[in-house]
Amino acid sequence: MGYEPDPDALRWGLHDLEVCTLTNAGSCSSVTRYESGGGGTQGYVREGYNQPVTGYVDNDAVIAQFYQDELSRVARAEASGINSLSPTSVVAQDWPHPHQGQENQGEAIDITQESDILHNHNGNMEDKNVARIRFEGGQSSPSRDDDSVCSVEIEEESWSEVGKRLNQMIPIAHVPKINGELPSEDEQISDHERLFQRLQLYGLVENKIEGDGNCQFRSLSDQLYRSPEHHNFVREQVVNQLAYNREIYEGYVPMAYNDYLKAMKRNGEWGDHVTLQAAADLFGVRMFVITSFKDTCYIEILPHFQKSNRLICLSFWAEVHYNSIYPEGELPIPEGKKKKKYWVF
């Protein structure tokens, strides 16, 4: 079976992530899969690590040169009309709009539904060796007003080079958790330097997000709407996703679920990997989170049902801060700095 490269993955250079060799403390590429246990609501996580492959280059300079050559090749392909994807077309998705109305959430609705075996959109069982973040459970929220329902059209799935490489990963058992303890000051400094080097290696830059406790939701807002200012709307939508589909997420929250929802409603409450999964499920998009972990270069989060081929890309300074990331030269222009448009008479 042939695979067409995912245009977004090429644009981001994500098809090269497997060769990241910034640390010798383990593999630099990891994805985690949440699988259903026997009870329907409980689950466990399997995390995969890339094994060393003989013949891959070790030298960071060589890797960086390879990446630059790849970018040049993609640019030539785009110039010749092979790839018609433009930054405008990437942004032009039919996401829920921040101005749309939303019903009062109220108490979380308890929907009882047994988990099914994971299938892809063609109905085929997925490769168990591909470790991906995905919670089991119900399919969608109860019927609500049309304005509050995601209207992103489901597109034909296109597996990227990253997806093909992830098939070679060997999963290991792992326990899901929400935010952990903050690292020490020294660890924070070294983690930040490691994250910076990884972003620099792959030609990615951070859109610096305000550190007010809303950084995850601001980063998601920036990726979805090209502005971090719609973070309250994104938080509201994510909390609704968690509330209306509690059977999917409750097993991964080590506290009373209603207390967790009340906390997540509050402005300034830190998001975690449960809210990231809920956001991926809500918008139906894949997420790539470049991390500062020693043994994990990136995490891929897959939605329960993919509705778009678009990628959401974040950086995660582990347990400290999220930023929105872009390829060099593609940072969105802040609202106040956009060029004025004049009518020509």
UniProtKB/Swiss-Prot annotation:
Reaction equations catalysed: Thiol-dependent hydrolysis of ester, thioester, amide, peptide and isopeptide bonds formed by the C-terminal Gly of ubiquitin (a 76-residue protein attached to proteins as an intracellular targeting signal)
OTU domain segment(s): 204-328
Residue positions of the active site: 212, 215, 321
Short name of one Pfam family: OTU
Hydrolase keyword on record: yes
Its EC number(s): 3.4.19.12
Protein family according to the UniProt entry: Belongs to the peptidase C85 family.
Protein name, entry field: OVARIAN TUMOR DOMAIN-containing deubiquitinating enzyme 9
Organism of derivation: Arabidopsis thaliana
